Amino acid sequence: MLDRGYTVVATDYLGMGIETVDGKQAGLGSYLVGDTAARSVLDSVRAAQQLEAAQAGDDVVLWRHSQGGQAVLFAAQEASSYAPELKIAAVAAAAPAADLTKLMGSHLDDISGVTIGSYAFPAFAKVYADVPGVALSSILTPAAIEKTPEMNSLCLLSSLTELHEIGQPLVGNFTLHDPTAVEPWATLLSDNSTGAKPFEAPLFVAQGSADELVLPADTAAFVSHEESIGVDVHAVTVDGASHGTIAYEALPELEQHVPINGGS
């Protein structure tokens, strides 16, 4: 993409990766918080435009995976109001965390749910601190509350083994209640799920058939919803691709259907 004249920008999400202070993450979290993540994505483009050598223009292709997929979908929804100077040419998401209710509901009693929850619940509790009943003690067990700061300090990609070692004893003892069924968590999960409003840019969605985190059926339901509200969607399923490999294995299809070759 660099050879084709594109400026490539990776988003530094608000609050994520910040050193902990007294065992607690400094700053507001943004993990799976749709509006915050969307603004981080759009602000990253604006930041690149401030670098003269980058020669970054206003035409933007948004492309991310998993949590990042949710972020670019929200960015596409919010771009016209938050960053109207940017022209979103296309949106692409691989195995996006599009429906948080389904994502959390599918993994309440496994290590994936513990891992995702260790990032998401503390982030929600900080961002929505003024919402009645949003304290971590309303949804997480004391054992989970004790371990989440340690898990928060680790990177999901580079420290997955360590994360799972910490989280495995919490499987079955992580939440006090089903967060998809009790308030205010059910509403927060719904509000941070994508698809509340359409956007004009074409959408490319890639899903791995062997993905055990973002389930193929959930992505198919998301695609159907986007189509029903008027979004131009091209969806592909890559046979045998897992959650960890789909972003790479979908690149050939991405190049065909997203304007990164100077095409339309």
Regions found by a protein language model. Give the residues of each.
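Short amphipathic alpha-helix adjacent to the substrate-entry channel of hydrolases
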Residues: 1-8
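Glycine-rich "HGGG/HGxG" loop immediately N-terminal to the catalytic nucleophile
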Residues: 15-30
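Alpha/beta-hydrolase active-site loop
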Residues: 30-52
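Short beta-strand/loop motif that positions the catalytic acidic residue
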Residues: 199, 204-211
